[in-house]
């Protein structure tokens, strides 16, 4: 199910309680997965959500999912009229910043094998539920390279 398509203006910030959602863009006839939302995480086309400009990305569910969501106007109202809303905004911003910073550091400092192992440790069930091509894209390798990583890891165990 597509939640946000390219050229849409993102209106929702989702908090997943079940299921998996991915954020991606298409380039040169292939999809590049930027983010995978897991249970207990927020996901959105956040730049479009904040700027109210058209999205360059697609947000789609990979499995059946359940979520809570805030619309842009909901959050504006909460921020303006409640002190806990301001705290919520700060926490959301911090969580998104930390996630992006950790993801960037992962690509700069870790090998694809280490990124795969990190993902496996954080979300072991995901390896079985999500098509390998999306996992490969998420860790920055081709599906063939992911197959080689998995084969090497299973040989060493």
Regions found by a protein language model. Give the residues of each.
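Short beta-strand segments in beta-sandwich/barrel cores
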Residues: 20-24, 66-67
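Short, Lys/Arg-enriched N-terminal segment that forms or immediately precedes the first helix
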Residues: 96-105
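Cyclic-nucleotide recognition modules
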Residues: 32-91
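Cytochrome P450 core scaffold surrounding the K-helix E-X-X-R motif
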Residues: 25-30
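Residues that scaffold the ATP/ADP-binding catalytic core of kinase and kinase-like folds
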Residues: 6, 24, 45-46, 77-78, ...
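ATP/adenylate-binding site constellation spanning eukaryotic-like Ser/Thr protein kinases
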Residues: 18, 39, 64, 72, ...
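Regulatory nucleotide-sensing modules
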Residues: 1-14, 18
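Phosphate-/nucleic-acid-contacting segments
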Residues: 110-157
